[in-house]
Amino acid sequence: MTLFRHLVRITSPRLPFICGSSRRFSAKTAAVERVVSSFRSVTGDEGVSVGSAVREQHGRDESVHRCRPPDVVVFPRSVEEVSALAKICHHYRLPIIPFGTGTGLEGGVGALQGGVCFSLRKMEQVVDLHQEDFDVTVEPGVTRKSLNSYLRDTGLWFPVDPGADASLCGMAATSASGTNAVRYGTMRENVLNLEVVLADGTILHTAGKGRRPRKTAAGYNLTNLFVGSEGTLGIITKATLRLYGVPESMVSAVCSFPSVQSAVDSTVQILQAGVPIARIEFLDDVMINACNRFNNLSYAVTPTLFLEFHGSSKSMEEQVSVTEEITRDNGGSDFAWAEDEETRSRLWKARHDAWYAAMALRPGCKAYSTDVCVPISRLPQIIVETKADLISNNITGPIAGHVGDGNFHCLIVLDPNDTDEVQRVHSFTERLARRALAMDGTCTGEHGIGLGKRALLREEVGPLAIEVMKGLKASLDPRNLMNPGKVLELTQTNTEQ
């Protein structure tokens, strides 16, 4: 079932431990208390909560999906506690839902079958920093902003920035990216090793315990197996990440265009010219107007590119010269520069606040972000067609995107109580995803599959690939306890084994 059908149809009974075979003991108060007591023996009383407010908080993310909350929330402080808690869940066949900061956009933390939420916020240590090797190992409670604050005096930084201050292990779990991906890659290119607790409590080091080579040809790439697995294969309890030197110089610019076509054509030509641009973000006229209103800015209300250049002063001069020539040839305006750190931060804050700026267009409504990605040569066509589709169907959906790697979002704002609008938006999102697939792209560039795109995943990769994924899942999690119902459709495995 796709996103908007969930939005209007999902209702779930809220009974304790409705999770497969656990139904047999859910009605037995003594058995429930025994399970909770087992959890408390691992974490202490403060590490377990069955309070409704805490459960509700941990049963939702930033998406429009609203299922049911978990039955219990646990707060482990170490990988040993995560392992011990997982073993208890495995014994009682209780679903496990990992929770980082709750900033996901595809319903990845919803407890479809109840069960136990593992909130990892108390595991917040930077474990190892190797400045000379440009790598760091972090626990799952460390966010991207807190890591970069920690690194501030080292001359290093971690560039992957999905916008929200997400947990780094959560970013690995969803293969997140962001505005810097065109230059520095996504999480998939920046994770060197993972420590993962499997469904039965086993602790796995995907590249070998303590290993952190910049490259390896040793066996199957287990690290990349877990990057993007969305908590369905295990709980990521440590991530070893690549770091980068802070560039000698950074400068940002804004350029306005007469049309969507000219702005996106410029993007493609800049990349084809080999300019190592650090960021190149597209905002359509609706989005730039929303950003102006929300952030008290005054950019021209036309299709716009936000750009950023990194490097030495000499190399940036060359990058800027080539880029300005291309944008000028496509009818772009003179660049409005943001050179000092404060001005650059204000510009990129406006871009990262796009979600909230879009929501402010219709106060009281809900927002949903699409997330398709296509080969960059197809980008002009798909954005122009998508813009026309939004207008013809009277949908509020400002467009913003990391167009340097072919990824863009429609930040759709809708009234969930208006069934006609919900249906129009649902139909639009299906058309958009299939338009991307028809152009050799993907239904999700960075948000993940979660709940809403499981059917589209099958269309994208085909039934054989889905069966291979199911086989991998069954091998690592034969009872289907790890975040069941996400990425792959729910099965009855955990009621049968």
From Swiss-Prot:
Keywords: FAD, Flavoprotein, Mitochondrion, Oxidoreductase, Transit peptide. Its EC number is 1.1.2.4. Belongs to the FAD-binding oxidoreductase/transferase type 4 family. Pfam families: FAD-oxidase_C (PF02913), FAD_binding_4 (PF01565). Involved in D-lactate, but not L-lactate catabolic process. Transmembrane segments: none annotated. One of its GO terms (molecular function) is flavin adenine dinucleotide binding. It is found in: Mitochondrion. Its cofactor is FAD. Residues 65-246 form the FAD-binding PCMH-type domain. InterPro entries: FAD-bd_oxidored_4_C, FAD-bd_PCMH, FAD-bd_PCMH-like_sf, FAD-bd_PCMH_sub2, FAD-linked_Oxase-like_C, Oxid_FAD_bind_N, Vanillyl_alc_oxidase_C-sub2. Its main location: mitochondrion. It catalyses: (R)-lactate + 2 Fe(III)-[cytochrome c] = 2 Fe(II)-[cytochrome c] + pyruvate + 2 H(+). GO terms for cellular component: mitochondrion. This is Probable D-lactate dehydrogenase, mitochondrial. Disruption phenotype: At 3 dpf, mutant embryos show no visible abnormalities compared to wild-type embryos. They do not display any ocular abnormalities at 5 dpf. They nevertheless exhibit elevated levels of D-lactate, but not L-lactate compared to wild-type larvae. Signal peptide: none annotated. The keyword Transit peptide applies. One of its GO terms (biological process) is lactate catabolic process. It comes from the Eukaryota.
